[in-house]
């Protein structure tokens, strides 16, 4: 059995790490490199960096900090933000990133997933899915351009359909960003995760809602996700990664202990 992964998420805007609630009202958390170094030292299995306004601004992720992060950490990291071409991806990988993640550009051009997977291998192609639960219809819908709340739009895709589509096209991993839960720290959407797990046959990463150590345990135990991504509980030092891993190990979760 592969070890489950704990993955801090760093949303980047204007060269700094920020955090919002339900993808809105972002506050500045701090500088990118010191935070990345801290999480690596605490025992994170990998890091994810989202340049949250790159796609909505029509630009690619700011590459200047990618190489600086690669110099100070020795764990894998993934970078996302406006990657729309093979050249964009090649540059980010050449600066030291281990994986690239695409979200809004994949919705605009689903063939991008296949082209990236064919060029770089499925192992480094992650597809992020921003999913919103509509209480009126009882359905989960995929959103696009979520880094800018004035441009966020609901797409034609229902989440379960898009999960299956991106796998057919070559996604090697899926990060499910559950927007309703984002930043509110009341737990992952286990019902949605279970539904996605049934149709997801590549590594699945849960994102949105972690507030306690028990929330991580529930995601691993009840929804069988491969990794759990979180931001505010780590940024605000509500949960220490080393202590979280020790707790999960006592609960029988296969986890890498530093």
UniProtKB/Swiss-Prot annotation:
Report the subcellular localization: Cytoplasm
Give the record's GO biological process terms: L-histidine biosynthetic process
Give the domain of life.
Bacteria
Supply the name of the protein.
Imidazole glycerol phosphate synthase subunit HisF
Quickly give the catalysed reaction.
5-[(5-phospho-1-deoxy-D-ribulos-1-ylimino)methylamino]-1-(5-phospho-beta-D-ribosyl)imidazole-4-carboxamide + L-glutamine = D-erythro-1-(imidazol-4-yl)glycerol 3-phosphate + 5-amino-1-(5-phospho-beta-D-ribosyl)imidazole-4-carboxamide + L-glutamate + H(+)
The pathway noted for it is:
Amino-acid biosynthesis; L-histidine biosynthesis; L-histidine from 5-phospho-alpha-D-ribose 1-diphosphate: step 5/9
Q: Which UniProt keywords apply?
A: Amino-acid biosynthesis, Cytoplasm, Histidine biosynthesis, Lyase
| Function description | IGPS catalyzes the conversion of PRFAR and glutamine to IGP, AICAR and glutamate. The HisF subunit catalyzes the cyclization activity that produces IGP and AICAR from PRFAR using the ammonia provided by the HisH subunit.
List the active-site residues. 11, 130
Gene Ontology CC: cytoplasm
Concerning NCBIfam families, the annotation shows:
hisF
Tell me a Gene Ontology molecular-function term this record carries.
imidazoleglycerol-phosphate synthase activity
What's the name of its gene? hisF
Keyword Cytoplasm appears in the UniProt entry: yes
Q: Which SUPFAM superfamilies match?
A: Ribulose-phoshate binding barrel (SSF51366)
* Stated family: Belongs to the HisA/HisF family.
Iron-sulfur as UniProt keyword: no
Where does this chain mainly localize? cytoplasm
Q: What is its EC number?
A: 4.3.2.10
Say which species the protein is native to.
Escherichia coli O139:H28 (strain E24377A / ETEC)
Spell out the subunit comment.
Heterodimer of HisH and HisF.
